[in-house]
Amino acid sequence: MKTTAKRTVYYQYPVELVWRGIGIGSDETTVDPLNEEQYENTEPDRGTVFTRAIEVKQNEVFHFRMKTWLFYSEWRIELSPVGPCETKVKFTNTIEYRSLRGFFYTGFGNLARSEVKAFSRQLGQKIEADFQKNRPAPEN
């Protein structure tokens, strides 16, 4: 069973700030990468998630796969500058359930939609916090 959710959000920030909010190139991001063979041959336990980047183009695309004990998930996040201070972000999340149990356990197929909605909202909050933190002090 597969479900797909798509959502387009406009953020009132430049594309570089949105990209940093996603976490790519951030000082906070730590990764222990798996190669393709390790990813395919490793099975996650409960509470474990394995992630594999498929395509990463700075300020444009972040495409990755996730594997949990219940489902496989494929995310594609596409960024497009609309102007100097606005960015269009298209989120696509496709979830393939590993069993009927996973389908029921995660809300009868509603997981893709709720994940896209939550991720886009959290990204907006993270971008705003980063903007406020790095905002130049007003001149007196």
Regions found by a protein language model. Name each.
Residues 1-37:
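Hydrophobic ligand-binding cavity/cleft-lining segments
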Residues 4-6, 46-51, 71-76:
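Short, surface-exposed coil-to-beta transition loops
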Residues 12-16, 54-59, 78-88:
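A short, structured loop/turn motif at beta-sheet edges
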Residues 18-28, 53, 62-64, 89-91, ...:
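Hydrophobic pocket/interface hotspot
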Residues 29-31, 40, 51-56, 80:
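Short, exposed beta-strand/loop patches in secreted or surface proteins that constitute
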Residues 34-36, 56-63:
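Short Pro/Gly-enriched beta-strand edge/turn motifs at strand-loop
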Residues 38-45, 62-68:
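Short beta-strand segments that buttress and anchor functional surface loops
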Residues 68-125, 129, 134-140:
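Beta-strand/loop substructures that line and gate deep hydrophobic ligand-binding cavities in soluble
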